[in-house]
């Protein structure tokens, strides 16, 4: 009985060890998913098609993944639009500040103020 417990614990350690996840790093380096069932032709393409060549109707998992990708794409577009608007507003603000600084540093007329008569108080 004790030998069975030792054997089971060694099997559990082997199953949870680095050996079980060894291919994940290689798959990431090759541009694939860390998990082989994450994405790719095996999960994205239909499992079968009709004999006359029509594609099979999409499965629930395919529809769910498609909806997730569309949602992510919408969010990316929204965030890039917000970034573009923010950059444009920042550029306008910087341009206005630069114009104000330029006006501050312009030469000011001094002689005309001295020649004009003082207003009666």
From Swiss-Prot:
GO molecular function: structural constituent of ribosome
Homology family: Belongs to the mitochondrion-specific ribosomal protein mL52 family.
Lineage: Eukaryota, Metazoa, Chordata, Craniata, Vertebrata
The organism of origin for this protein: Mus musculus (Mouse)
Example GO biological process: mitochondrial translation
Transit peptide endpoints, chain numbering: 1-22
Pfam families (UniProt xref): MRPL52
One Gene Ontology cellular component: mitochondrial large ribosomal subunit
Primary localization class, coarse: mitochondrion
Biased composition range(s): Basic and acidic residues: 98-109
Keyword Mitochondrion: yes
Protein's recorded name: Large ribosomal subunit protein mL52
InterPro entries (UniProt xref): Ribosomal_mL52
Region named Disordered: 98-121
Cell location: Mitochondrion
Keywords (A to Z) from UniProt: Mitochondrion, Ribonucleoprotein, Ribosomal protein, Transit peptide
Description of how the protein assembles with itself and partners: Component of the mitochondrial ribosome large subunit (39S) which comprises a 16S rRNA and about 50 distinct proteins.
């Amino acid at each position: 009985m004790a030998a069975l417990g030792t054997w089971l614990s060694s099997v559990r350690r082997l199953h949870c060890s680095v050996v079980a996840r060894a291919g994940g790093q290689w798959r990431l380096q090759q541009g694939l998913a860390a998990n082989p069932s994450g994405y790719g032709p095996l999960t994205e393409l239909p499992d079968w098609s009709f004999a006359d060549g029509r594609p099979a109707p999409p499965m629930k998992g395919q529809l769910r993944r498609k909806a997730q990708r569309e949602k992510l794409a919408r969010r990316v577009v929204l965030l890039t639009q917000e970034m573009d608007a923010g950059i444009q507003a920042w550029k306008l603000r910087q341009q206005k500040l630069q114009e104000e600084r330029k006006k501050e540093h312009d030469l000011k007329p001094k002689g005309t103020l001295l020649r004009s008569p003082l207003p009666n108080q």
